[in-house]
From Swiss-Prot:
A Gene Ontology biological process term: reductive pentose-phosphate cycle
Keyword tRNA processing: no
GO molecular function, one term: ribulose-bisphosphate carboxylase activity
Record protein name field: Ribulose bisphosphate carboxylase small subunit 1
Cited function: RuBisCO catalyzes two reactions: the carboxylation of D-ribulose 1,5-bisphosphate, the primary event in carbon dioxide fixation, as well as the oxidative fragmentation of the pentose substrate. Both reactions occur simultaneously and in competition at the same active site. Although the small subunit is not catalytic it is essential for maximal activity.
Domain of life the protein comes from: Bacteria
Additional remark text: The basic functional RuBisCO is composed of a large chain homodimer in a 'head-to-tail' conformation. In form I RuBisCO this homodimer is arranged in a barrel-like tetramer with the small subunits forming a tetrameric 'cap' on each end of the 'barrel'.
Protein's gene: cbbS1
Record's subunit section: Heterohexadecamer of 8 large and 8 small subunits.
Family: Belongs to the RuBisCO small chain family.
């Protein structure tokens, strides 16, 4: 069995901070993000975009970018909204969420653009 790898994360080192499961993997490129959006759409979940300042990522609510995209199935539209949020708030973290109507919870959540650490 291979050795367990330590994923150090500390508040002092802003570049080591982890947000969710995907933050322990290499950064997602545009193709991998697109596949995640395809997965959200294939599950019938409602996508939404949120953003926040890096210093508030852990102890504050994130701001909703517009309204959740209820019933949106066009992957390009969802990706354009995430990009528009990033362009409007270039220093903020931007995350994509898939809301599951059946379970009435988040089915997926991932940071798609990392903000500039302070």
């Amino acid at each position: 069995m291979s050795e367990m790898q330590d994923y150090s994360s500390s508040l002092e080192d802003v570049n080591s901070r982890k947000f969710e499961t995907f933050s322990y993997l290499p950064a997602m490129d545009a193709d991998r993000i697109r596949k995640q959006v395809e997965y959200i759409v294939s599950k019938g979940w409602n996508p939404a975009i949120e953003h926040t300042e890096p210093e508030n990522a852990f102890d504050h609510y994130w701001y909703m970018w517009k309204l959740p995209m209820f019933g949106e199935t066009d992957i390009d539209t969802i990706l354009k909204e995430a990009e528009a949020c990033h362009k409007a708030h270039p220093n903020n973290h931007v995350r994509l969420i898939g809301f599951d109507n059946y379970a009435q919870s988040k089915g997926a959540e991932m940071v798609v653009y990392r903000g500039k650490p302070v």
